[in-house]
């Protein structure tokens, strides 16, 4: 018959070893928590679906619904939405039933200011240094060296999506500088 002894074969963890393990776990948790935003910065945002692009967001962060958007805006309006990489992007209302198949990035190519649409002059005018762009975002007056970037606009299930523009720039006939 086997005799049961009072001593265990597994040594108990000492206080020092327990405190070292606790300290290591705490430091590791804090380090991982601090590194999470850094790692997240280098991972591009998801495309938001099956190749449809990134959903355009309004000023409140809600998805842009085409039917409501068209009801609230007039033909010829250029309205800011949150687009690719979170950049402000103009959607162009072409008719009471449709928006343009392109969006215009609102970031000035000179120093990065957000360029407002000036409806009375039918052009974009940068408030920082006076650069001007026509209604399609093509630069017409410097100091901006390049036209505003473009994005493709598509509609799926009445929601507006933006995707990168990689084809020839229809305004200049050149390859896109932003791609």
Curated annotation (Swiss-Prot):
CDD domains: Rieske_cytochrome_b6f
Main location: membrane
PROSITE patterns recorded: RIESKE (PS51296)
MF annotations from Gene Ontology: 2 iron, 2 sulfur cluster binding; electron transporter, transferring electrons within cytochrome b6/f complex of photosystem II activity; metal ion binding; monooxygenase activity; oxidoreductase activity, acting on paired donors, with incorporation or reduction of molecular oxygen; plastoquinol--plastocyanin reductase activity
EC numbers: 7.1.1.6
Residues that coordinate or bind [2Fe-2S] cluster: 108, 110, 126, 129
UniProt-annotated location(s): Cellular thylakoid membrane
Bilayer topology annotation: Single-pass membrane protein
Domain Rieske: start-end pairs: 61-162
InterPro entries the UniProt entry points to: Cyt_b6_f_Rieske, Rieske_2Fe-2S, Rieske_2Fe-2S_sf, Rieske_Fe-S_prot, Rieske_Fe-S_prot_C
Cofactor(s) the protein needs: [2Fe-2S] cluster
Annotated GO CC locations: plasma membrane-derived thylakoid membrane
Subunit structure: The 4 large subunits of the cytochrome b6-f complex are cytochrome b6, subunit IV (17 kDa polypeptide, PetD), cytochrome f and the Rieske protein, while the 4 small subunits are PetG, PetL, PetM and PetN. The complex functions as a dimer.
NCBIfam families from the UniProt entry: Cytb6fFeSPetC (NF045928), PRK13474.1 (NF010001)
Protein name (database record): Cytochrome b6-f complex iron-sulfur subunit
Provenance organism: Synechococcus elongatus (strain ATCC 33912 / PCC 7942 / FACHB-805)
Gene field: petC
């Amino acid at each position: 018959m086997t005799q049961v002894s009072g001593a265990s074969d597994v040594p108990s963890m000492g206080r020092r070893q327990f405190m070292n393990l606790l300290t290591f776990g705490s430091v590791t948790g804090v380090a991982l928590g601090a590194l999470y935003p850094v790692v997240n910065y280098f991972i591009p945002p998801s495309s938001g679906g099956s190749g449809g692009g990134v959903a355009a967001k309004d000023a409140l962060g809600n998805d842009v619904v085409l039917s409501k958007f068209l009801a609230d805006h007039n033909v010829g309006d250029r309205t800011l939405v949150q687009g690719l990489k979170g950049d402000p992007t103009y959607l162009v209302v072409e008719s009471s039933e449709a928006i343009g198949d392109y969006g215009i990035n609102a970031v000035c190519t000179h120093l990065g200011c957000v360029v407002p649409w000036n409806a009375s002059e039918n052009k974009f005018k940068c408030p920082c240094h006076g650069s001007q762009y026509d209604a399609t975002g093509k630069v017409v007056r410097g100091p901006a060296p390049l036209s505003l970037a473009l994005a493709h606009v598509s509609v799926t299930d009445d929601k507006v999506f933006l995707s990168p523009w990689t084809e020839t720039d229809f305004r200049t006939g050149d390859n896109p500088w932003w791609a």
